[in-house]
Amino acid sequence: MKYVYLWYVKITHTAMKKYLADSNYGSNWLAKAKEVVKKHDMKLVLLGSPFAAVEQFVVGVETDVSLDEFGKVTSDLYHIEPEFVEYGKTMIITQ
């Protein structure tokens, strides 16, 4: 079965201050997130900022792996940069 996982990212207050001072800070994290998805051999379908959401970023991938396997991706995303991610939440869409 194919899935689309949307991982919504709320960044920390410290990260938000850095992001507001320099928009490249967020862009750099998104570029690294793209590399994480590529490393896990998943198809990137969405990368950016969700509209009208509490979270600042969203990473969307299309894959046939289970949610447990996708957890390895989110773990790597959490560890891109210390103190960047406050929390992440996943939305699953089955195809």
Labelled PLM ranges:
Residues E55-V58, E86-Y87:
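Short, surface-exposed coil-to-beta transition loops
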Residues E69-Y78:
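Short amphipathic alpha-helices in soluble, non-transmembrane regions
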Residues K39-H40, L77-E81:
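Acidic-histidine catalytic/liganding microenvironments
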Residues H79-T94:
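Conserved short beta-strand edge segments in small beta-sheet-based binding/regulatory domains
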Residues M1-Q56, D64-E69, I93-Q95:
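Short S/T/G/P-rich N-terminal loop/turn motif that feeds into the first structured element of a domain
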